[in-house]
């Protein structure tokens, strides 16, 4: 199911301008570095004072809302796919943050079609601490939620310029861009993911960086990262992370 979904994504990427050359890769790296050089942002409340990329959808009086999202998905051979993660909506107008922790299991129904079973646990953030706003069914899950850390809080991309031979795509009309690199298990961020998650493979991941916003602009657009350890019809292991800046009226949780 994951495999087929990714095929659709790859087909859509074919509309992008590929093979941009070394100069475009350097330009894209430089743009990503405007955001990634700030990692780690250990205190998420710093987002209250951080400006983002604003398009025509923004009201002039709206300071915007940051959405941070981290999740790990594991589908072992012969078993269902499970995703655990958290989403926070950091509202710069009200300087309040709410969101939810979620556990999503994807199984096949009697007709072989994928079926989602997602459970959400609402949370808020105060003083950089995650606090469940409703009773949690067990202490283990409660601790898992309270101790959750977003990738943006511990990642470090100081060596991004050392990433070489990336697959580069750029669409100036959106504008959007992406870069894909093969990493090794000695990479700092790979080590951090293995430290925090029980990743059942020794295979090193590929890193896909996706972003939008003006490459030459000074403001920060949306940034999406995906570490794919295993991807095939029988088994999938991947970690995804997103930092997005949106109009506050689109704040949903």
Curated annotation (Swiss-Prot):
InterPro entries (UniProt xref): Csa, Csa_sf
Location relative to the cell: Cell membrane
Cellular component, GO annotation: plasma membrane
Main location as per UniProt: membrane
Covalently lipidated residues, kind S-diacylglycerol cysteine: 20
Lipid anchor positions (N-palmitoyl cysteine): 20
Keywords tagged on the record: Cell membrane, Lipoprotein, Membrane, Palmitate, Signal
Family the UniProt entry places it in: Belongs to the staphylococcal tandem lipoprotein family.
Protein's recorded name: Uncharacterized lipoprotein SE_0145
Species this chain originates from: Staphylococcus epidermidis (strain ATCC 12228 / FDA PCI 1200)
């Amino acid at each position: 199911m994951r495999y087929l979904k990714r095929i659709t994504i790859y087909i859509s990427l074919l509309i992008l301008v590929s093979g941009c050359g070394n100069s475009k890769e350097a330009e894209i790296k430089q743009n990503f570095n405007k955001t990634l050089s700030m990692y780690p942002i250990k205190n998420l409340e710093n987002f209250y004072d951080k400006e983002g990329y604003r398009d025509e959808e923004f009201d002039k009086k709206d300071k915007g809302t940051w959405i941070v999202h981290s999740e790990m998905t594991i589908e072992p051979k012969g078993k269902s796919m499970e995703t655990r993660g958290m989403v926070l909506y950091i509202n710069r107008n009200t300087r309040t943050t709410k969101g939810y922790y979620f556990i999503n299991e994807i199984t096949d129904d009697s007709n072989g079609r994928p079926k989602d079973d997602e459970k959400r646990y609402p949370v808020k953030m105060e003083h950089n601490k995650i606090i469940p706003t409703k009773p949690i069914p067990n202490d283990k899950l409660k601790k898992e939620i309270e101790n959750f850390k977003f990738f943006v809080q511990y990642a470090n991309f100081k060596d991004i310029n050392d990433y070489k031979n990336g697959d580069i795509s750029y669409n100036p009309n959106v504008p959007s861009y992406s870069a894909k690199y093969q990493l090794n298990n000695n990479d700092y961020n790979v080590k951090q993911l293995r430290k925090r998650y029980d990743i059942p493979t020794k295979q090193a991941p590929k890193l896909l960086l996706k972003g939008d916003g003006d490459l030459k602009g000074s403001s920060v657009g949306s940034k999406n990262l995906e570490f794919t350890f295993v991807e095939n019809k029988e088994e999938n292991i991947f970690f995804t992370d997103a930092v997005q800046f949106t109009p506050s009226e689109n704040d949903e949780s």
